[in-house]
Amino acid sequence: MANHRIDRVGMEIKREVNDILQKKVRDPRVQGVTITEVQMQGDLSLAKVYYTIMSDLASDNQKAQTGLEKATGTIKRELGKQLTMYKIPDLVFEKDNSIAYGNKIDQLLRELDKKD
C-alpha cells in the first residue's frame, strides 16, 4: 500500500516541478529543462528529480544543474503551497541520461541494419 502512495507523491512532484520551472522560475539557465522522473525515498524525505535538457553541450548541462540547485529553495516553497504534505521532501537534481542512452542504442541498431 505504501508503494502506491510513494509513486503518487513522485508523480505529483514531477508534475508540479515541471509547472514551477515553466511559470515561476525565471532563471535562464533552467529554460528548456524537462523533468522526466522523480524517485522518492521510502519515508518521503528525499526526492531524486531527474531532468533532461535540449542542448547536448556540456556547458549548458552544467549551467542547468547550477540553475536547478540555486532554484531548489523556490521550488520547495512553491511545492509547499501546492502539495498537502506535512513535510516537503528535500530535492536532489540529477541529469537523466536514459534518453541519450536510448538514442545511442537506436543509432547502433540502424548501423546494423545498414550492414545487412
Curated annotation (Swiss-Prot):
Gene3D superfamilies: 3.30.300.20. Disulfide bonds: none annotated. InterPro entries: KH_dom-like_a/b (IPR015946), RbfA (IPR000238), RbfA_dom_sf (IPR023799), Ribosome-bd_factorA_CS (IPR020053). Its main location: cytoplasm. HAMAP family: RbfA. Monomer. Binds 30S ribosomal subunits, but not 50S ribosomal subunits or 70S ribosomes. Belongs to the RbfA family. This is Ribosome-binding factor A. It comes from Streptococcus pyogenes serotype M49 (strain NZ131). The gene is rbfA.
